[in-house]
Every structure is written in structure tokens, then in C-alpha cells.
């Protein structure tokens, strides 16, 4: 069995989380040489480790965190985070504590160690450095970056950006999300199926 990685790389509000939830319910069939694989998808996030560390630093339980890390509240200041919003707290821990003191690849290393056999769907790509351990773990040929276009969505005010796939040497595809969810999901599935069945 092979580890495959599909990384969604898109601005907030563009539909990447919805696409990942849709793919988790899918099974993909593809051939490698003379072997046919039928794989389900597993959801992974670079920020999984970051969430755990941030909760620990601010002494916040998982239940408390989950109550506040919602679309409505994640931008709202919270006294348990010393007046930071949950999103600001994540950026503070990542950019001011972990990366300067450990490595810019820290969260990528953590994710690479936790990959499943089969198809891993990563919903929060946005830093080139975090991709390096993943590339080392599975190989460039086993990674697809899905970038999403949606009107009105940008990385403005976000520490993430579009991955430099040319520099990283990995494949990318663009999917438009300016129509219905049905069309969007169909395009995402076709993009992943097309990549899985490419001659490698």
C-alpha cells in the first residue's frame, strides 16, 4: 500500500474544509503498475499539533477550545487566551514560539510521522517549509496540491499563502469554486481521480 497526499491550499472561506469533508466519504480506485488499489481517504491537518500545543500553553481544555474555534468566534478576543482571538493565539504560538525555537519544518515533521497508508487529505497547506518533511516521507510523485479559486477570498491578513509548487517540485491543480457546491465537489473529485490515474 502506498501513502498518497492531497494538500488543499487556498484562502479562508474558499471551500477547502467542505471539499475535505466530502472526500473523506469517497473511495478512489487507481492502478500502480499491475496492481489495483481501492483506497478511502483520511483527513489530516498541519495545525493538529499546533492546536494541542496552543491549548497546553494557555491551559484551555479541548472542549473549551472547540466551543470557541468556530467560524463565528475564532476571530473574537478571549480572556483565557490573554485577550487574543483563537486565530491570533495560533499564529502567536506558531510564528513566535515554535518556528523560531525549533524549526520552520516542525509541524510538517509532526504530520509526516502521522500519515496513513492510503490517501491522506490535508486541509490546511500554506507554508513551503512544512511540505519538505512530507515530500521526504512520501516522495514528490505521491503529492498533489489542490488550489482553489473563489471570488472575494484571499490570504490577506493570513500567515499562509499559496505554495510554490514549482520550487517544491510537486504537482498542482486549480479548482474553481464560483458555482454550486455540487459542481465544486465534482471538479475536486475529478482532479484527484485524474492525478491518481496519471502514468507515473
Task: Briefly describe each language-model feature range.
Residues 124-127:
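Short, well-ordered beta-to-alpha junction loops that form the rim of enzyme active sites
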Residues 9-12, 105, 110, 115-116, ...:
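Small-molecule kinase domains that catalyze NTP-dependent phosphoryl transfer to phosphate-bearing small molecules
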Residues 16:
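Conserved lysine of the Walker
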Residues 8, 122:
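Hydrophobic anchor at the beta1->P-loop junction of P-loop NTPases
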Residues 19:
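Hydrophobic positions on the alpha1 helix immediately C-terminal to the Walker A/P-loop
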Residues 25-42:
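Post-Walker A helix-loop "phosphate-sensing" segment adjacent to the P-loop in P-loop NTPases
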Residues 2-6, 41:
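Extreme N-terminal starter segment of soluble prokaryotic enzymes
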Residues 37-41, 46-120:
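ATP-dependent small-molecule kinase phosphotransfer cores
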